[in-house]
Every structure is written in C-alpha cells, then in structure tokens.
Curated annotation (Swiss-Prot):
EC main group: hydrolase
Protein name, as recorded: Carbohydrate deacetylase
Lineage: Bacteria, Pseudomonadati, Pseudomonadota, Gammaproteobacteria, Vibrionales
Domain of life: Bacteria
PANTHER family: CARBOHYDRATE DEACETYLASE (PTHR31609:SF1), YDJC DEACETYLASE FAMILY MEMBER (PTHR31609)
Binding site for Mg(2+): H59, H122
Cofactor: Mg(2+)
Assembly with partners or alone: Homodimer.
Origin species: Vibrio vulnificus (strain YJ016)
Length: 252
C-alpha cells in the first residue's frame, strides 16, 4: 500500500507554512494544499518555489476569510464566508456562485505560477451536498484529483483510493496511526492521510481552535519511529501524482 500524507492549510500563517516545510524536508509529507487570499500566502508561494518535490494543491475556502468574487449568496452580513457552524445547515446556496468562486480560486492559484497538483477544501466544504457536484465538475475540467467525496474513487483513479481524517485531534499518535493504516492496507492501494503540521505562532492561535495539537502532529510526522514503522509494514510514502484524474490509470 502507498500513503499520501497531505498537509492542509498552507498559506494560513507563517508558522503553518514553516511546519509543513519541516514535515516535508524532515518527515513524510509529500503533498500540501494551499489557501489563497490568506495572510501567509506570499510566504507559502516563496517556500513552494524552492521545494520542487512538494506537490501543492488548492485548499478551497468557503468557510474562512472573504470570497474572491461578489458571491453574496456565499457570505454572511459581514462579507465573510458563512461561518463553519452555519455552513453545513444551509441548503440555499447558488450553484453558479459556488462555481464562480471555486474557479476564481483555481485561477488565482495558477496565476501565482504554481502547478496545481490536486484540490480539496477547508473544513471539507466541498463535500457539502450542494458543493460536491460543482467542485467535482471543476476538478474534471482542470484534470486534477479531488479529495475523496464519494464521487471520486476507484472509477476515476483506476485504483482503490481511500481518504482518512483519522490522524486528528485526540487520535493523533504514532501507534494509533499505524494501527489504522494496517486496517486499511488489505483493502486499498492508496490511502490519503489528512494532517495539519505547524509551528505554533500567535497568528495561528488567533485564527484556529486547532493550534497546539499541530505541533504534536509535526513531531510524529518527522519522527524516525514513524518512518521505521512504515518501512517495517511495507507502506510506501508517495504524493498526489500517484492519482491521475482519468479512468483506467493504474496507481498500484
């Protein structure tokens, strides 16, 4: 089995960026997804330009910050995106507004000069029932993989792909992670593990309720213990280039 450790939130804060780079250079992270239009975006781009082996995708924003378009249907009274707590309860989103905003973020990302590796989203917003089909079509248009939604799986990738958010919060630990991967090994060819490594900074503490835990993630993702365990169990670390958004491709 192969495993993709994808680090979310690239571009959120400098501490997040530095943690992701540390997890890439000294650990098992080979892929990340960047949030455009966020405070540490320029810093993230500068770092990415010096890391050719780090595959960078787009971390679509629909629950954080302000939109790039004038999609009034997507925001609250303050002009920011609908807060996370309210986002999932709404069922009145305009699919055209969703499409326009997502495309704007993709095009913004490409204009930064980065190669688009794949697409996912902050708080898994693209799995909202009104967002899912729209974002799926956009991923197909740009011919890049989309983090598992139920619409994209073996039929698209040509292999048994599985996404897991197990490595998060109270479940962050070496033993827990390895045991979880072993339960998946016989059933899947490629498993994506969501992760959030970071070096804690004041900006992160101010904008995220998930802050201190990120340093524990970083410690595990860069540990010799994890690298040895993966080799012991014949689990190969890979990146999102393993998944090609086209039928009949074998990623085994």
């Amino acid at each position: 089995m192969k495993v993709i450790f994808n680090a979310d939130d690239f571009g959120l804060t400098r501490g997040v960026n530095d943690g992701i780079v540390h997890a890439h250079l000294d650990g098992v992270v080979r892929s990340t997804t960047m949030m455009v239009g966020m405070p540490a975006e320029a810093h993230a781009v500068e770092l990415a330009n010096h890391l050719p082996e780090l595959k960078v995708g787009l971390h679509l924003r629909f629950t954080a910050g302000r939109p790039l378009t004038e999609g009034q249907n997507l925001v609250g009274r303050d002009g920011d995106f609908t807060p996370y707590g309210q986002f999932w309860h709404r069922r009145d989103y305009d699919p055209i507004a969703i499409h326009n905003e997502a495309v704007a973020q993709v095009e913004y990302f490409l204009a930064l000069g980065l190669n688009l590796s794949h697409i996912d989203s902050h708080h898994h917003a693209h799995t909202h029932p009104q967002f899912e089909p729209v974002i799926y079509d956009i991923a197909r248009t740009y011919q890049v993989p989309l983090r598992s939604t139920g619409l994209a799986g073996e039929e698209e990738f040509g292999c048994r792909y599985h996404f897991t958010d197990h490595f998060y919060d109270k479940r962050v630990g070496h033993d827990s992670l390895i045991q979880h991967l072993l339960t998946l090994k016989e059933h899947y060819d490629v498993v994506e593990v969501m992760c959030h490594p970071a070096i804690l900074d004041t900006a992160l503490e101010a904008c995220s309720g998930y802050a201190k835990q990120r340093e524990l993630e970083l410690a595990i993702l860069t540990s010799d213990e994890l690298k040895l365990s993966l080799r012991k169990h014949d689990i190969e670390v890979t990146d999102y280039s393993e998944l090609i958004f086209a039928p009949l491709h074998s990623c085994v």
